Design a protein with these regions (language model features):
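Walker A/P-loop
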Residues: 6
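Short glycine-rich anion-binding loops that position phosphate/pyrophosphate groups of nucleotides
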Residues: 70-72, 94-96, 143-144
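A glycine- and Lys/Arg-enriched "phosphate-lid" helix/loop adjacent to the NTP-binding pocket
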Residues: 84-128
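NTP-dependent small-molecule kinase module
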Residues: 11, 15, 61, 125-162
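ATP-dependent small-molecule kinase phosphotransfer cores
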Residues: 22-83, 107-108, 130
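ATP-binding Walker
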Residues: 3
């Protein structure tokens, strides 16, 4: 959430001439409604079930850059599945920076409550142990999307050499 996953992912996919996959977009296509609407009508558990289904399908993709929602990697099962088939990269930013980036966005159902700043801190506290299990962890606070993409590309090239 607010770390640049989609922007950076698209840049990397373009550079590598890979397919770009956004799991949130796939979920919306499958559900036939927006993520906000899924949360409103069916709840977070239904959304997480869609995520699980999509992750199960991702293992068959080749030459793809996959951007996941911030909560997808906070599931041990999803993270293990992704790590079997891919280099898992976590883009990171502090709660303050994330808030600065997302505060005007209305499509983030987990931030619709009275105190979204606190919610961001709480979400990151729960998710951080999972995020730290990524193969590559990149702080995006002071880097442009292009700089982050270059860093991830370098890590990808190193991983391919192993």
């Amino acid at each position: 959430m607010g770390t640049g996953k989609s922007s950076v992912g698209r840049l990397i996919a373009d550079q590598l001439q890979f397919t770009f996959v956004d799991t949130d977009e796939r979920i919306e296509e499958r559900a036939g409604k927006s993520i906000n609407r899924i949360f409103e009508q069916n709840g977070e558990s239904a959304f997480r079930e869609y995520e699980r289904q999509i992750v199960d399908e991702l293992g068959t993709l080749k030459r793809s850059v996959i951007s996941t929602g911030g909560g997808l990697g906070a599931s041990a099962e999803n993270l293990a599945s992704l790590k079997q088939h891919a280099l898992v990269v976590c883009l990171w930013a502090s709660p303050q920076i994330i808030w600065k980036r997302v505060r005007t966005q209305t499509h983030r159902p987990l931030l619709q409550g009275d105190d979204p700043k606190t919610k961001i801190r709480e979400l990151l506290a729960v998710r951080e142990p999972f995020y730290r299990q990524a193969d590559v962890l990149v702080n995006t606070e002071v880097r442009s999307a292009k700089e982050v993409a270059q860093h991830v590309m370098h890590e990808f090239q190193l991983a391919r050499q192993r």
